[in-house]
Amino acid sequence: SHGDYTMNDASLDIVHAATDYGDYDALMDEYLSCIKMTDAAVQELCDYFTAQYEKTGRKVIVAMAGDHAPSFVGHVADPSFAETDNELQILERSTPFFIWANSPLEHTAAATSTTDPLNRMDMVMLTPTLLQQAGLPLSDYYEYLLEMKHNTPVVTAANDYMKVDGSTAETKFITFQEL
């Protein structure tokens, strides 16, 4: 999402957007092509670690995530998906993530939301969730974050947050003088 998606010759794009994005067509084609190639590389990586586990028993966990949608998302996304500015912030700052292991994880239920079908969490929550799923010890701070995740799984740098039910709000800061 930080890339300059106009670097390659357009003939190298392996994916072409079905939707007309106007001035952003070439950008979308390269961005989507990068996603397609990344997907194939991740599959190759997972296949490699699966084979390593079968040969050696070495356990590996892979976590992949982004910290926000690409910078051009505001030009190509349909804003009607968000009812409020807070919800739009959450959507724009959300990206898919996954945690994969080449062996069974024992604590996966703790990482799954029972109220949010998209199972969203922010980047701060990813590390303690990964450690928890791996069955590794957690610091007091990570324990605190996991407890917080039960009520507020997403907090953005723009002070927007998402409650466990998927509703969004904005944190209001007041100055000492306003008290």
Where are these regions (language model features)?
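Solvent-exposed soluble domains appended to multi-pass membrane proteins
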Residues: S1-L179
